[in-house]
UniProtKB/Swiss-Prot annotation:
This is Putative pituitary tumor-transforming gene 3 protein. It is found in: Cytoplasm; Nucleus. Keywords: Cytoplasm, Nucleus, Proto-oncogene, SH3-binding. One of its GO terms (cellular component) is cytoplasm. One of its GO terms (biological process) is chromosome organization. It comes from the Eukaryota. A motif (SH3-binding) lies at residues 163-173. The N-terminal destruction box (D-box) acts as a recognition signal for degradation via the ubiquitin-proteasome pathway. The gene is PTTG3. It comes from Pongo pygmaeus (Bornean orangutan). Its main location: cytoplasm. The keyword Nucleus applies. The keyword Nucleus applies. Belongs to the securin family.
Amino acid sequence: MATLIYVDKENEEPGTLVATKDGLKLGSGPSIKALDGRSQVSTSRFGKTFDAATALPKATRKALGTVNRATEKSVKTNGPLKQKQPSFSAKKMTEKTVKAKSSVPASDDAYPEIEKLFPFNPLGFESFNLPEEHQIAHLPLSGVPLMILDEERELEKLFQLGPPLPLKMPSPPWESNLLQSPSSILLTLDVELPPVCSDIDI
């Protein structure tokens, strides 16, 4: 048997609750409350109840019957225990804030300034732009193959040659003159085959 004594916060009158440990779990047994000399017996009810005093507020409408029954039981059993919960939560919150304050590292002392360890200037990176005296935007470079030069003297020779021109690809013979007769086009497509060997038996 466990006897728990609580003080009613609104009326400041002591009220006692006498219940077994098993009776506090899930509303398995009846709990007897003695407040102001009146004794009330509350038992867990199953199914629909039509009493106005025990009706749930409008916020908890009955959507699923089993869920609402479980919430009714938890509200009935945990009702007198709600007065102790804020004290525990306040203690836990103060412990958490103390831990958070102690875990916050010092901003300047613990860590060096990482930004100054790797200094860089975005303008100091390699620029792949050509200098102004070697601008090639005005040159027609469509079709020019990529040329890789090994030495700088070959680069000077390239600038002495003048602007490069696109290469002229030779057109295939069947596309060179569309006005040719089909027989002349077929003659260009003829391929000489090796002579037939009559000695081999098939």
